[in-house]
Amino acid sequence: MARRKTTKRKVKKNVPFGIAHIHTTFNNTIVTITDANGNAITWSSAGALGFKGSRKSTPFAAQLAAEAVAKAAMEHGMAKIEVFIAGPGPGREAAVRSLQAAGLEITAIKDVTAVPHNGCRPPKSPRG
C-alpha cells in the first residue's frame, strides 16, 4: 500500500501590517502581499484568475487580482498596508483602488519602477 503524502497546511499568521507589491506590465498584473521582512503571505495575478491573452492586461483584471489578495491578507489579520508599484501597465491605479475598497488601510504609496540609466535598447515601438 502506498504511503499518503503529508502536505503542510497553510498556517494562519497574525500579521497586522504588510507591504503590497504591485507589478504591472503591458501583458499582466501581479499583486503580492508580504510582511515587513519581505516574506510573501499571499499573491495573485490576472493570469492566475483565469484571464487569458489581452484580457490579462486590463484594469478590470488587475482589480480582481488585488481584491483576491486583499481578502486573503485580511484572513491573516492584516489591516494596514504600504503599497509599492512597479511597471508601466494599465492596472496600476485600478489595483490600488481595489485594495483600498476591500477594506485595507493604505499608509503610503511608492513608485519603485526601475528606470535605466540608458541601459538596454527598448523594444521597437508599434506603428499604427
Swiss-Prot record:
Key words of the record: Ribonucleoprotein, Ribosomal protein, RNA-binding, rRNA-binding
InterPro entries linked: Ribosomal_uS11 (IPR001971), Ribosomal_uS11_bac-type (IPR019981), Ribosomal_uS11_sf (IPR036967)
GO cellular component: ribonucleoprotein complex; ribosome
One GO process term, biological-process aspect: translation
Molecular-function GO terms, alphabetical: rRNA binding; structural constituent of ribosome
Chain ranges passing through the membrane: none
Gene3D superfamilies documented for this protein: Ribosomal protein S11
Protein family (similarity comment): Belongs to the universal ribosomal protein uS11 family.
Task performed by this protein: Located on the platform of the 30S subunit, it bridges several disparate RNA helices of the 16S rRNA. Forms part of the Shine-Dalgarno cleft in the 70S ribosome.
Protein name per UniProt: Small ribosomal subunit protein uS11
Organism, as annotated: Phytoplasma australiense
High-level lineage: Bacteria, Bacillati, Mycoplasmatota, Mollicutes, Acholeplasmatales
